[in-house]
């Protein structure tokens, strides 16, 4: 009953208007407001400020700056193995496994297609058919910068407008096609093992999604926007390099080509991850 009410409320709340309202409070520099928000958040989620590059909460300009705080250089070591695919974020695995044809498993009986998720053409979708996927949920208490699972050259980024349902486990199990329905950006990289997709999915009260190459991407428009990247503007990122950030929390979805990687045996649904740890092993070399 409680879960049904939670889902019902999400269906009637104006997602974007509510998120903009929360976004205003998160961006305000009014001292007492931002201090109240930050202090309450640290206490509610037991945030470890000792690992933050700036450990003093009072030194953040606003709640957003605190939320996407940088960590000390040694806080998240990047797996050094040459064949390591690493976690792009702190979070928990929602689902991972093989892509069934062009279908990606969400939860229970819910699936969505590669084309729906990426808003791409058949040619790109076919490159991920039968491949591997992982969905990583970033809770409010997690570090909210997203990093590269492997080194790559950015070739394309799609902005896809949509809803802003919560992406917590309750909603994931009850809203069909959730990750292909919410507002998101899909970044496609060329790697040594073929294409790799990193999708940053927006959610309720996520005021914006940012990338390191184009800054704030959302909220953008009501239309799909496709950007292609090539010379002279080449954007190359190494394994573990930051690629974007959420203001506030959400989900990252990873896609890999068929046969490119093998998930570590101890990585499964509900596994807690830290950015930079090895989650899969590269199976093919260019």
UniProtKB/Swiss-Prot annotation:
Molecular function GO terms recorded: phosphatidylserine decarboxylase activity
Q: Could you give the cofactor binding note from the entry?
A: Binds 1 pyruvoyl group covalently per subunit.
Q: Which GO terms describe its biological process?
A: phosphatidylethanolamine biosynthetic process
The record places the site described as Cleavage (non-hydrolytic) at: 249-250
GO cellular component, alphabetical, reads: plasma membrane
Name the pathway: Phospholipid metabolism; phosphatidylethanolamine biosynthesis; phosphatidylethanolamine from CDP-diacylglycerol: step 2/2
Enzyme Commission number(s) of this protein? 4.1.1.65
**Where is the protein found, in the record's own terms?**
Cell membrane
**Named cofactor requirement(s):** pyruvate
Q: How is it modified after translation?
A: Is synthesized initially as an inactive proenzyme. Formation of the active enzyme involves a self-maturation process in which the active site pyruvoyl group is generated from an internal serine residue via an autocatalytic post-translational modification. Two non-identical subunits are generated from the proenzyme in this reaction, and the pyruvate is formed at the N-terminus of the alpha chain, which is derived from the carboxyl end of the proenzyme.
Record has Transferase as a keyword: no
Answer whether the UniProt record assigns the keyword Lyase to this protein: yes
Reaction(s) catalysed (UniProt annotation) = a 1,2-diacyl-sn-glycero-3-phospho-L-serine + H(+) = a 1,2-diacyl-sn-glycero-3-phosphoethanolamine + CO2
The first-level EC class reads lyase
What are the Pyruvic acid (Ser) sites (modified residues) in this protein? 250
Record keywords: Cell membrane, Decarboxylase, Lipid biosynthesis, Lipid metabolism, Lyase, Membrane, Phospholipid biosynthesis, Phospholipid metabolism, Pyruvate, Zymogen
Tell me the membrane topology, using the record's own terms.
Peripheral membrane protein
Task: Output the InterPro entries linked to this UniProt entry.
Answer: PS_Dcarbxylase, PSD-B, PSD_type1_pro
Q: State the active site.
A: 90 (charge relay system), 147 (charge relay system), 250 (charge relay system), 250 (schiff-base intermediate with substrate)
Describe the protein's quaternary organization and the partners it interacts with: Heterodimer of a large membrane-associated beta subunit and a small pyruvoyl-containing alpha subunit.
UniProt similarity note: Belongs to the phosphatidylserine decarboxylase family. PSD-B subfamily. Prokaryotic type I sub-subfamily.
What does the protein in this record do? Answer: Catalyzes the formation of phosphatidylethanolamine (PtdEtn) from phosphatidylserine (PtdSer).
The molecule here is called Phosphatidylserine decarboxylase proenzyme
Query: Lineage of the native species?
Result: Bacteria, Pseudomonadati, Pseudomonadota, Gammaproteobacteria, Cellvibrionales
The gene that this protein is the product of is: psd
